[in-house]
Amino acid sequence: FKIGSIMGIPVKIHITFLLILPVFALVFSINEPPLGFAGTTPLILNYALSLLTTILLFACILLHELGHSYIAKSYGVEIKDITLLLFGGVSSMEEIPRIPSQELRMAFAGPFVSFVIGVVLLVLNYIVVSFVPGYADTSIWLMFYILGSINIILGLFNLLPAFPMDGGRLLRAWYAKRMSYIKATHYAASFGKMFAVLMGILGLFFNPWLILIAFFVYIGASEEDKSTTISILLEKYI
């Protein structure tokens, strides 16, 4: 359901967002520093900081999506809405720019926003911890450290060269400078599928979460390949 608008773009939240919100807050509350607030504050304040950190994290994800949307709008692409859901955020666009240079800038805009947020939070946090007496004894510095670190990780994760991550679109834009858009999509999707299989194999030995992410990546790559091919073929006959 809709919660507001930014830059004329409706912002919505999916029911899965409401389900994941308390889960993230719980994770932050039970993990010890620097990954959480366990043992740093009284229990009620711990939960409050954990929930606030979770809300601010999804606000950062919204800014990440707004980065994509801002560049897309500058190229005349209509943005239907931005939806926050279980695994982050999604910008619904009428179409993806097929000019490689435009898609490249649009795809990189999201990770760039995440990197800027992460670096600014970590640098400011370091400066304040170093020069403001007593600040290091509070849990506020920990909240900004967590948010800064996660934004850097979010930016790096989204640069993985596989759909539906931004890195998959960057890879397609690189291919599209050298071949047709359909073929570029197919190559980028195939690379993403191989990447997902490798990630799934690693997940069997190291972390089961990698298997879930691999499944998500494989399906995303397959759907992008299929939807792009159908869209372009329909344009030729309509």
Language model features by range: what are they?
Residues 1-238:
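Hydrophobic transmembrane alpha-helices and their immediate loop junctions
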